[in-house]
């Protein structure tokens, strides 16, 4: 075989052996065995292990003589030897402590590229070993070398050049100068710029995972991946944001987080010009333009743009909730939901709006809030022209037009257009109310409801209407209010043609025609078309009146009733009729009043065909035709027992 080249390594590390088969007693096998035996038998005091024992050089003619099996074995052995030597570079501190080489000399093993004609496979291995520094060879001055056969050694003298403390810093740096990726794995066309990366890449095909976590038993391809994973168990977060103090497990997470404060969005969509702070978000966004939904749910057939969305969706079918809050015991289907929930207990709000000073628990809330200041709404519905500030809102809105309701309740069979609505609905069946108000003790099923409720006590109304100056507790209330000024009503009832300013109002209205009442009181059996009405009704049984007027002390069961009552004291009437100028204290009263001008009569009695402007009048009419209280003496019927008693007292029935 060809001549051997020298490369010296000072080491006492041993390598795990692995068997090779294919042909007997080949020099290639001896090379691998020599590396193991040399490293196992020698100690620090024995001296140096030479690469002479483990490296084999072939000439062009000799290489041609090898059969395919021998060439494959050669590749496997040399890759393993190389990866073992690379592991020394990453772990050993020998080079820092022992003065083996002069600072003017570098011993470099340079394995030139070779190519197999039968298979598309290339290999290039190179490593630089010296005492303190790893130097970038691309800018060496006075490069001198010799090449004899397929592998060569270069001894280089160098001047002042950029240096790197560890090989893992130098190796990625060298790839900047040459975009060459000489390592190609035969299973698929996937090029790697470093031999060690090829070794790691091969493990993805062989499913080989040597690094096991002692905490949970999970296996990983590399020691780096294991170290990253272990931070979940230790809770280590060494990277801290100087702006808000939030800590992160990884530096990359800190870099991404800092963009929230700086507002930097380097990733721009070429289709619509929208910019993102993360490349991942741009990739997700671009799928909206393409319209490709390649991930399909086997359970319900729903398709998704991204695999992560499919994985999250499938949890709805399984009902799995592996993430549990240690504070209140509440379980979640996703880790990020648990993280969000825990902030309710801590009260931490690190994300502050620079415009109005409002603070938020999560960065995405701040991002969405900032859109209220800019008024930007780039996502427009092709069906009705309504615009939205985020793509997810447009997708959810589109379901109103299509009627799609993929989320079904297993208890009552009711379907919803959003998974969030299903989660909220399910709490009606369980009666779960984990969120309690510290002020009045009232409990809520959802954290958002508690936040809104607390504003009743604090009186906080941070959302102001620019048209009339009226303030609201939430952005949602402000959005609904603004429709009164614009008069926009894009949602129309197919049954009677009535239009509404929001889709939820249309859904609730349609129940008048269908007679559907899915919300039933467990106390008295009375059913309601809206969950909100059931909640209000239940207070009749409990007698609960937590909302008290500061002016006169009158108590109410519901916050909305208190707000309406307070207008009696202030005489506030902000809703004016454009037809006659009459003002009203609430938007509902204005809507009812306007029917006198339009002559609109939406409510029809099925018994006699008579129509009414208000539902309450229809109910009254039905009651008039049903007189359950009869006077035994003459048989006259009455609506209420008080009337029959009065007639008895005055002897009118005698």
Curated annotation (Swiss-Prot):
Stated family: Belongs to the krueppel C2H2-type zinc-finger protein family.
Keywords per UniProt: DNA-binding, Isopeptide bond, Metal-binding, Nucleus, Repeat, Transcription, Transcription regulation, Ubl conjugation, Zinc, Zinc-finger
Zinc finger (C2H2-type) stretch: 183-205, 211-233, 239-261, 267-289, 295-317, 323-345, 351-373, 379-401, 407-429, 435-457, 463-485, 491-513, 519-541, 547-569, 575-597
Residues annotated as domain KRAB: 49-122
Domain of life (superkingdom): Eukaryota
One example GO MF annotation: DNA-binding transcription factor activity, RNA polymerase II-specific
PROSITE patterns in the cross-refs: KRAB (PS50805), ZINC_FINGER_C2H2_1 (PS00028), ZINC_FINGER_C2H2_2 (PS50157)
This protein's name: Zinc finger protein 283
SUPFAM superfamilies in the record: beta-beta-alpha zinc fingers (SSF57667), KRAB domain (Kruppel-associated box) (SSF109640)
Function comment: May be involved in transcriptional regulation.
Gene that encodes the chain: ZNF283
One Gene Ontology term, aspect cellular component: nucleus
This protein's record includes keyword Transport: no
């Amino acid at each position: 075989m060809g001549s051997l080249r020298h490369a010296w390594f000072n080491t006492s590390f041993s390598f795990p052996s692995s068997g090779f088969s294919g042909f007997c007693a080949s020099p290639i096998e001896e090379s691998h065995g020599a590396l193991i035996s040399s490293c196992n038998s020698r100690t620090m005091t024995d001296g140096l292990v030479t690469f002479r024992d483990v490296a084999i050089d072939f000439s062009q003619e000799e290489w041609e003589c090898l059969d395919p099996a021998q060439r494959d074995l050669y590749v496997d052995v040399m890759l393993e030897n190389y990866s073992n030597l690379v592991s020394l570079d990453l772990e050993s501190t020998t080079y820092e402590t022992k003065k083996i080489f002069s600072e003017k000399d570098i011993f470099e093993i340079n394995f030139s590229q070779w190519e197999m004609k039968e298979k598309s496979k290339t290999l290039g291995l190179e490593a630089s070993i010296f005492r303190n520094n790893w130097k970038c060879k691309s800018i060496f001055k006075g490069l001198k070398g010799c090449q004899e056969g397929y592998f060569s050694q270069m001894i280089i003298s160098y001047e002042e050049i950029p240096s790197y403390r560890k090989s893992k810093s130098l190796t990625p740096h060298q790839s900047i100068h040459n975009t060459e990726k000489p390592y190609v794995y035969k299973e698929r066309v996937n090029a790697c710029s470093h031999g060690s990366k090829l070794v790691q890449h091969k493990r993805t095909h062989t499913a080989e995972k040597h690094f096991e976590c002692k905490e949970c038993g999970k296996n990983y391809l590399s020691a780096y991946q294991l170290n990253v994973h272990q931070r979940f168990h230790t809770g280590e977060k060494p990277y801290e944001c100087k702006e808000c103090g939030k800590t992160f497990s990884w530096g990359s997470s800190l870099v991404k987080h800092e963009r929230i404060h700086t507002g930097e969005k380097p990733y721009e969509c070429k289709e619509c010009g929208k910019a993102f702070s993360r490349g991942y978000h741009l990739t997700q966004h671009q799928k909206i333009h393409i319209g490709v939904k390649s991930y399909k749910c086997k359970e319900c057939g729903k398709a998704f743009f991204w695999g992560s969305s499919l994985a999250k969706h499938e949890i709805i079918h399984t009902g799995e909730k592996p993430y549990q809050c240690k504070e209140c015991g509440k379980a979640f289907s996703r880790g990020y939901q648990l993280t969000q929930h825990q902030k309710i207990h801590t009260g931490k709000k690190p994300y502050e709006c620079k415009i109005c000073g409002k603070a938020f628990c999560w960065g995405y809330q701040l991002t969405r809030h900032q859109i209220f200041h800019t008024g930007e709404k780039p996502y427009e519905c092709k069906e009705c022209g309504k615009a939205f500030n985020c793509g997810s809102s447009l997708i959810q809105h589109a379901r109103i037009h299509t009627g799609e309701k993929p989320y079904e309740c297993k208890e009552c069979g009711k379907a919803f257009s959003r998974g969030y609505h299903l989660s909220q609905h399910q709490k009606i069946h369980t009666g779960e109310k984990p969120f309690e108000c510290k002020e009045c003790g009232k409990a809520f099923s959802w954290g958002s409801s508690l936040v809104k409720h607390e504003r009743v006590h604090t009186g906080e109304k941070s959302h102001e209407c620019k048209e009339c100056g009226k303030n609201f507790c939430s952005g949602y209330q402000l959005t609904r209010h603004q429709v009164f000024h614009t008069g926009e009503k894009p949602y129309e009832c197919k049954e009677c043609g009535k239009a509404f300013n929001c889709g939820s109002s249309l859904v609730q209205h349609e129940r008048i025609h269908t007679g559907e009442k899915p919300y039933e009181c467990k106390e008295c059996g009375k059913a309601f078309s809206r969950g909100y009405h059931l909640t209000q009704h239940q207070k009749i049984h409990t007698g609960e009146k937590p909302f008290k007027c500061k002016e006169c002390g009158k108590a109410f069961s519901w916050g909305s009733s208190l707000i309406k009552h307070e207008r009696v004291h202030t005489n506030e009437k902000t809703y004016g009729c454009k037809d006659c100028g009459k003002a009203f204290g609430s938007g509902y009263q204005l809507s009812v009043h306007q029917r006198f001008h339009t002559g609109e009569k939406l409510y029809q009695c099925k018994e006699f065909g008579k129509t009414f402007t208000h539902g309450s009048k229809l109910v009254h009419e039905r009651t008039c035709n049903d007189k359950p209280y009869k006077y035994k003496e003459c048989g006259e019927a009455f609506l209420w027992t008080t009337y029959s008693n009065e007639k008895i007292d005055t002897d009118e029935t005698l």
